Amino acid sequence: MLPHGLIVSCQALPDEPLHSSFIMSKMALAAYEGGAVGIRANTKEDILAIKETVDLPVIGIVKRDYDYSDVFITATSKEVDELIESQCEVIALDATLQQRPKETLDELVSYIRTHAPNVEIMADIATVEEAKNAARLGFDYIGTTLHGYTSYTQGQLLYQNDFQFLKDVLQSVDAKVIAEGNVITPDMYKRVMDLGVHCSVVGGAITRPKEITKRFVQVMED
């Protein structure tokens, strides 16, 4: 089980300056030394490098685009197999109700339970309906990761209306809830923890210096 506290997302996509398994392992080490209780990471290669560097539980994902589907976070059993090989403690996958490129969500959950019975599963959702569906399927964790990042929730921010969406999710499911997406200040982190989430994933505000720099520059441009 993931501990209560701060999970730091250590990810850099191929078009980003810090794209490197070695660099992500050092990001994870910095997060560990700062007090993080877990890491969220993308790709088998990054996860293996991180697990060689820090003794923390890892939420693993594989981001891969597929034609004719907007699902890109651990979309098929191919990505699941890569994550099983990485020996991450938690496999996270898109648990929205969008059309998937291959297996159904139910099939993927069954696949993970069969092939990796000791691995926990996290649902990345965008709506309360999707949270309820993930709970029905038996996900161990339900994360607000994709709220604001789907075509039907675009423009919505997790912290709007004092985290009302997060409150709605907490009231709708019994599974452990993870706050993720636009938790960008220590005060926001404290607020979501006070609301009763199991843990919170913070990425961009800690491990993406390019995006952090942009926010400083844009303050003056605006």
From Swiss-Prot:
Q: Which pathway does the protein contribute to?
A: Amino-sugar metabolism; N-acetylneuraminate degradation; D-fructose 6-phosphate from N-acetylneuraminate: step 3/5
The record's comment on protein family reads:
Belongs to the NanE family.
Give the record's keywords alphabetically: Carbohydrate metabolism, Isomerase
Reaction(s) catalysed by this chain, per the record, are:
an N-acyl-D-glucosamine 6-phosphate = an N-acyl-D-mannosamine 6-phosphate
In short, the EC number is 5.1.3.9
Q: What is the main EC category here?
A: isomerase
Q: Which Pfam families match?
A: NanE
Stated name of the protein? Putative N-acetylmannosamine-6-phosphate 2-epimerase
Task: Outline what the protein does.
Answer: Converts N-acetylmannosamine-6-phosphate (ManNAc-6-P) to N-acetylglucosamine-6-phosphate (GlcNAc-6-P).
List the gene name.
nanE
Please give the superkingdom of this protein's source. Answer: Bacteria
